Swiss-Prot record:
Spans annotated as Disordered: 1377-1399
Domain BEACH: 336-608
InterPro entries named among the record's database cross-references: BEACH_dom, BEACH_dom_sf, Kinase-like_dom_sf, Prot_kinase_dom, Tyr_kinase_AS, WD40/YVTN_repeat-like_dom_sf, WD40_repeat_CS, WD40_repeat_dom_sf
Cellular component annotations (GO), alphabetically ordered: Cul4-RING E3 ubiquitin ligase complex
Species this protein is from: Arabidopsis thaliana
Name used for this protein in its record: Protein GFS12
Gene: GFS12
Record-level Gene Ontology MF annotations: ATP binding; protein kinase activity
Amino acid sequence: MRGEDSDLCFDCLDQRINSDFSDQIVFSYGVSDSPLPFGSSAVVKVSDSSEEFSASCSSCESTSSQFILEYLRKDEHGCLAKYVDKFVVKDREGNSNDAVESDECLDCSTSGSQATEDDDTENITCGSVTCEHSGSFSCWRTVAALLPIAQIRKCSASELQKLASSFHYECPEDQILASLHRLIDGKSSGQATHSFLCLLLGLPLLEEKSKLRCLRHPNLSPVLGLLTSSDCLVSVLPKAPYTLENILYYSPSAIKSEWHRNFIIYQLLSALAHLHGLKVSHGDIRPSNILLSDSLWSWLTIYSKPDLGSVDANSSASRRRWCVEGCYSYGLYADLKISSHLDWQTHFDKWWKGELSNFEYLLVLNKLAGRRWGDHTFHPVMPWVIDFSKKPENDSDSGWRDLRKSKWRLAKGDEQLDFTYSTFEFPHHVSDECLSELAVCSYKARRLPLSVLRKAVRSVYEPNEYPSDMQRLYDWTPDECIPEFYCDPRIFCSLHPSMSDLAVPPWASSPDEFIRLHRDALESPHVSSLIHHWIDITFGYKMSGHAAITAKNVMLSSSEPTVPRSVGRRQLFFRPHPVRLGFSREKEQSRNELEMHTFHGFGVDNKRSVILLADEYLEETEEASAFSDHATHLCPKYHLRENLVESPLHVSYSENTKKVNTSLPGTSKNKGLSSRISLNYLLEHMEVRDEASTELQELLQWRQDFCTGNISKDIAGDIFSIGCVLAELYLMKPLFNSVSLATYLEGGDLPELIKELPPPTQVIVEACIEQDWRRRPSAKSLLDSPYFSATVRSAHLFAAPLQLLAKGQTRLCYAASFAKQGVLKVMGTFVAEMCAVYCLPLVTTPLSEDECELAYVLLKEFTKSLTPMAVQRLVLPSIQKILLTTGYSHLKVSLLQDSFVRELWNQIGKRVYLEMIHPLVISNLYNSPDKISASAASVLLIGSSEELGAPVTVHQTILPLISYFGKGICTDGIDVLVRIGRLLGVNFIVKQMLPLLEHVVCFCIDLSSMKKPEPVHSWCSLALSDCLITLDGLVALISDELLIHELTKGRLCLHVRVLMQKNLELRVLQFAATSLMSICQRIGQEMTALHVLPQLKELFDEFAFSEKSTDASDSLSWKIRTAEQKFHPESPIKSRMDLVLLLYPSFASLLGMEKLRQGCPTWLLLEQYLLKHHNWKWEYTGRSSRYNMEARPVLKQGPASKHTPKVLLNGSGRSVPQSQGLRNSNHLKLHIHVPVEGQEAVLNPLVHEPWSWFPSPVTCWDGLDIGRFGNPKDENRWKIRASVLSSARAHHGALRSLVVSEDECTVFTSGIDPGFKGSVQKWELASLSCVSSYHAHEEVVNDIGILSSTGKVASCDGTIHVWNSQTGKLISLFSESPSDQDQASSDPSSKNNSNPCNRHASHGLSSGIFDENLYTCMHYLEYMDQLIVGTGFGALRFIDLARGQKLELWGGEAIESGFTSLVSALCSGGSQTKHGDGASVSPSWIAAGFSSGQCRLFDLRENGFISSWRAHDGYVTKLVAPESHLLVSSSLDKTLRIWDLRKSWTPQPFVVKGHNDGVSGFSIWGKDVISISRNNIGIFSLAKSQDEEEQQQQRIIPQKLYMAEKGGRVKSDLSTICVLPFSRLFIVGAHDGHLRICC
């Protein structure tokens, strides 16, 4: 740790950076270990407007332009300074100091510089008499090994910008990864690759006498450069987003598991093994020095201390010597007594005794909470102690701010905070930050650059909007104060001419006086007697638990606790903070002392100390001591020495140095040393075999056997620090504090906390912190210990190369090539999942064609290698981003191929595909999509429609595409609709598609006749065009007989209805006329005259009588035009009257003039008009007239396709459908699909088509959706008609349970069969027929569940049968024995589980369960592949399905009578919950309902009991968790109840009544809940239960189910219900054994 005396104040540091680098380098904030704004490091932003730099930033993993500059005084870093000066001299002599560009230059003769032939780096030393480096590891050689990529440059802005550009664009370690990629591909690789792999594997170099390779270990922070000035060196490092300290303080859940903890430690040990191999100790390992990336990859920092070899390292230079002369900040903080060398306990004791001011103590607390000076997002916070209403006086409460309440509470009021807490989704009173960036920048507005104000406050700078005086500033914000208002008068003075100075209160004459009075107020007796309350609210126990609720201080919690955070609120204390000694108001009043005197200085008033009673003083002392002992975690210790002044370059030899091999240490457990590391060698090291958890005995044997005596005391100190960090990762608090460390060193007594560690971790930690440093293991020995599993080693070896500073393309090549060689399969699914976070971000960046192929390979390999849940959580978000890209993307087209999608289906199932991918496939067919992407998407949709089934296809493909009519749907989108019609058959076209299209046409016609804005009318015309094109394509597929039948249904021909409209665009009318003639020619002369011509009479009459209004000049122009050019029916018409020219001559040719004149009374007027304007005259020649307007569509000629869409989709190639024509704004060409070769042009209707029972959804479809602009994914509420579409007799007795497969094509039912035995039947919904049965049950089956996409089914009849639904063979059988009940007593949730059960707690749904040892219900945990089953004695049994064995038993629920009740319902929270990206998350809790009406909540992750409450007055029939915080329950007490678990673990329900009988079950679709009671169904909305909090009840209106065809009611009682969300259907089972499909 750098001493404060060698630090700059942040003002001087800012000025120094500006002086060295100009204003192109923006100072963000300083970095310091001190509570005061002094330090030698700063976070800066490097600005560069060059296009190359901007483009490079976008292609790099880290797009941030922030870097850390650390100033190192040359007189404190002598070795490093001489090393740098050597290359500065060489640079002057003409030698290049650019970064290396080839493997052959990667040696330690230069720090990234090419060596000259006469360099003798083996014997180079720095020349310092005190330098202890010697031998093969010389001082300069060690520096080069630690800084292999650092470029040495002059200190200037341009050089720093070059370093930044090199980091983002040139990527100095790209060559190493490229060489490794060549090795994986079986090509020749350089020596650097071998050296790098030896570095990771811990192997010695092949030639020990060769020059040491200059390679950075991936877990050491990269020093990009060393910039030199006259007196300083400036090291340049990329800024890491987090430190381990950040994670432990603000987002501990980001370290998700024990594996992640061990992985972090393994990385640190790997870096230490490299350092120790160089005979270098780190010396300062602590969480704040461990940097983490977004993916939690670790970097260990180096070079943060002066070295021992410098002549002035031990001299004490004053702070004034390095700051500028007359530094203002030095005067501000000169009298403060705090120091970074003192721990919290010392500062607390000084403050409590009055030796430290309130201001100083609060600064210490800010530092402990992680707050940073100058960082506007996380600035130190101070309390407002006065309200500025008047000048405060010590003898009055007037003018003082109430420190017992938060500023947020004072500003908002209790009523508003109570409302916020009770109504918001995440209950809270206050924000998650007591001092926002907006408030800080507003406070400091006079001193900050305008660019900062525009970014943080408002983009448009308005100086008058900023508070002008302190009173307004205080009233304006609910945030707390900043330290500057207590110490720095400059904050009032404006640097901006347009903004006035901040006015001080009237009782202060100047800013200086205000600062003095404000500071005095902070130190006054009034504040000293109350400041502990503010500490409790801001840093203490009132931040959580019941105390936070009482104080109205519940903070807004993070919605994603597993996401790493670098800022947040840290709770320092967990019990009330003691009042300052002598300032207790209660004791002051009890003693009846004199009124308070004015407080002088920072000490305690002598008069007050005299009158303190001895017992009261002792009581306060004991209270403070107990508080201090309880907060020892604020004094962490990670080292055995207090003052660490040695350099990391300090040589660390053991007593047996001469006996130690100076090369990098090898390992005894390596699988042999290969003379050449090959791909097979790497795969062998990465292979993960099935292994059990670490055995404690094996670890104990390792500790006894590991080699000792080859490490130095300094290196052993690093191992001690590693042990402390490992323990803290598990304990979430430091292992040692100052007291416990002293006790341990003195007597060897280990801290009590160590007993809380898992036994294997405890063994490792005890070995690392061994009191005798000679007995501590080396880093290499720890890496090879059995503590680290093969999964950790494999993941590190695979991921480490990806952390090199290489280009995204190179990293992608490495990952894809390695994955293609089978590394993911070799590593196993778990390691592949852990490594996905390092690989998948590479595929979502802009890629070239070649890179797209690599990205496709990588996605495909991860899809095959990961578990379904992992694919859903990790791979699908990347696929979603790719499918959402606009324009052409080679990768997107690849992902839309059938081979990939089917593989995805097999992994994640169709339900997840339909939720997360299918809507994005459809989105590629509208809004001017790329033609190739649209073609690929259309082929995919066509081929998937048959497998998805008619109901899903209609609701998830056809309706969304129709909703895009008029909104930019492309030709391929319409082609999808037509080809799906061809694929699913003529009955599907007639029954499903034609009614939908008719609905669209009628809706558009009705809308066009209304007075609407122009965009609406324009949309109507576009939608009609799309609809008519689709209609024509479908009509071409049906027979003439069916076509005539559709025309003779009594409905007006749609085309004629369109032609009758006067508000539609002419191109729509022209297309309708052309289409109508095509239909007429198909049905023939007689049918046209019989059915079509009468409907045209009104239209012809309109044309005849409107001819007189035609303008004469217009007629003349028409005559001239028609005389010069013959009119063609495809030529765009100019007016509505031109339809006469399209229709009348064509009908004359088709019907003959005589029949036409008979059907058209106004024939004379029309023929006169045609003769006059178009020179048309009927001439009978036995054939058609010379102006025969034949409207038959011209079929697109070309080679016929040899494959049906199904074959096209299933192929491995990337076939796309041929275009069926183009549409544009001026001309609409009719699209009729050419029949596939070998098939008939028209489809013949089948008698027994699949899904024949499925009705048209048009009756449930809201036409208004068509005109609404928005995402069709945002569906409206389901309109349930309570109509039975089809039914079948499934069982002889009652149908007890049913479950539907995720593709909604198969349903399993269980019920009572003859002999009161149970059976399970498998039904295909397409034909509504039973295809197989399972009859191995001896009792009635009460519950069934589909376990996975592999076809396994579990069924419960008191025992659990797991069987294969394809073969019907039993896989596993599980049952409970009486002896198993004794296990439940060990469950943490059970107090007494040995009581007899209630054998009569059964009801109609569970008849047959009379034995307490029988299983009653079950719930599948997909994430864990486990089954939770309830028992008759109220316990929960876990079953591992993969291993086929029973796991733990959680105890049952005891009721007042001493009996237990059976478990009647189970569910888990989280498994159905989705992230914002749609990915499922693992369940975090389990809810169990009981026959007694009780409900219990269990913590699934911690294996503990959470809560229990009386949920119902009767048997709980079902539990469902629609969201992570919601629980819905039903009961035989006739109610359903909704429980919001966020507000309390014993929540108040939202009660839903209305049923007259017990609710036997329910099912949820979206926000709608469909419940069943007897023979009634009831519907209510979850949205109302959340939006209308004041309404405590919602009533259900029961409905009867009606038979769709017969119209009669369903009289049988309903027993179970299941919703088919994608099909918009639901299925009910009844006591009469029937299975009924309803809508």
